[in-house]
Amino acid sequence: MDSNLRNLKDFFTLYNKVTELCFSRCVDNLSQRDLGGHEDLCVDRCVTKFARFNQNMMKVYVDVQTTINAKRMEEMEENARKAEQQQREQEKERLKEAAATAVLTPVQPPVAGNLSM
């Protein structure tokens, strides 16, 4: 729910910035209720320009983020392979040490006890 709320907040922040920017650039006369012809055209162009810019920037962001994510996945897979290889090598070393210890350690024969009943 927090991400949805954050997205909504970001949307309204962006909307307010576009509104403020285009209003300050395009509206010259506040004495009339309706926009004049040139004001209407200016606002339309301003909003269209901003929307296209935002869309192009998001395309670039998605492309770059996709590349970054692919590199991260490759790095994670490489690190996992290295860790697995290192674990195998450590296991081999432990087995070698265990085998060497088993060969060097004499086995005591069982002590004959009293078998009478």
UniProtKB/Swiss-Prot annotation:
Which parts of this chain are annotated as the region Disordered?
A: 75-117
Q: Which InterPro entries match?
A: Mito_inner_translocase_sub, Tim10-like, Tim10-like_dom_sf
The reply to whether Signal figures as a keyword in the UniProt entry is no
User: Which residue ranges does the UniProt annotation give for the motif Twin CX3C motif?
Assistant: 22-46
Biological processes annotated in GO: cellular response to hypoxia; protein insertion into mitochondrial inner membrane
Q: From the Swiss-Prot or TrEMBL record, state where the protein is found.
A: Mitochondrion inner membrane
Per UniProt, which keywords does this protein have?
Answer: Disulfide bond, Membrane, Metal-binding, Mitochondrion, Mitochondrion inner membrane, Protein transport, Translocation, Transport, Zinc
Q: What Pfam families has UniProt attached to this entry?
A: zf-Tim10_DDP (PF02953)
Q: Which residues form a coiled coil?
A: none
Topologically, how does it sit relative to the membrane? Answer: Peripheral membrane protein
Q: GO MF terms on file?
A: metal ion binding; unfolded protein binding
Question: Where are the disulfide bridges?
Answer: C22-C46, C26-C42
Q: Where is the composition biased (Basic and acidic residues)?
A: 75-97
Zinc recorded as keyword: yes
Example of a GO cellular component annotation carried by this entry = mitochondrial intermembrane space protein transporter complex
Gene3D superfamilies to which the protein is assigned, alphabetical? Mitochondrial import inner membrane translocase subunit tim13 like domains
Assembly and interaction partners: Component of the TIM22 complex, whose core is composed of Tim22, associated with peripheral protein Tim9b/Tim10b and the 70 kDa heterohexamer. In most cases, the 70 kDa complex is composed of TIMM9 and TIMM10.
Question: So what does this one do?
Answer: Component of the TIM22 complex, a complex that mediates the import and insertion of multi-pass transmembrane proteins into the mitochondrial inner membrane. The TIM22 complex forms a twin-pore translocase that uses the membrane potential as the external driving force. In the TIM22 complex, it may act as a docking point for the soluble 70 kDa complex that guides the target proteins in transit through the aqueous mitochondrial intermembrane space.
Family to which the UniProt record says this protein belongs = Belongs to the small Tim family.
Quoted from the entry, the domain comment is: The twin CX3C motif contains 4 conserved Cys residues that form 2 disulfide bonds in the mitochondrial intermembrane space. However, during the transit of Tim9b/Tim10b from the cytoplasm into the mitochondrion, the Cys residues probably coordinate zinc, thereby preventing folding and allowing its transfer across the mitochondrial outer membrane.
The name this protein goes by in its record: Mitochondrial import inner membrane translocase subunit Tim10B
Organism from which the protein derives = Drosophila melanogaster
Gene designation per UniProt: Tim9b
